[in-house]
Amino acid sequence: PGVWNSTSDGFEINFVGKGGHGSRPHVTIDPVMMAGRFIVDVQSVISREKDAARFGVVTVGAVQAGSAGNIIPDTALLRGTIRSHDEATRTRMIDGVERTAKAVALMAGAPPPEIKITAGAKAVFNDEKLAARSGAVLKAAFGDKARLVPEPGAASEDYSEFVMAGVPSFYFGLGGLDP
């Protein structure tokens, strides 16, 4: 019963600098440096702004910038995901991602970055009564092989749309764990 998995929001951040040759970095605004600083600095949102007792993670999974090792590009594009188990943590982390990206660009003397947050699936909440009834049926059918997963996971699932619509729900996996 309760939270089964996490929310999942996507983000794209495009840092815009001023490209140039690697031999003259002083006449550029390096978006790769901004991207690197953001990747490191955004982790402080998790460690210093999010309640330590709440789940939340920000992952940068893609970085695209430049075409050669001796050329500072004009832009650096980051793509990532923000995951949490509750709306307050989700909101705080989205705010932190946006604020950190803007601050990094400001420190570099660059224009504000282009930030796109894409709302994804909400967390799935299992109905307590339905979970108890269904759990008893699964236990009767599978005996000791039926296991309750005690902690919610970090995966996401659009099944949450049923829950958000008010449908009493119980989400479970069958054969999803090693025997």
What kind of region is each of these model predictions?
Residues 1-126, 153-156:
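Midchain, well-structured core segments that form catalytic/ion-binding scaffolds
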Residues 101, 135, 159:
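Generic structural marker for isolated residues within well-ordered, non-membrane alpha-helices
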Residues 111, 144-145:
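Short, structured loop/turn "capping" segments at alpha-beta junctions
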Residues 124-137:
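Short, low-order "capping/linker" segments at domain edges
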Residues 139-143:
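Acidic, glycine-rich loop-and-strand cores that form catalytic or ligand-binding grooves
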Residues 147-179:
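Zn-dependent metallopeptidase/amidohydrolase metal-coordination segment
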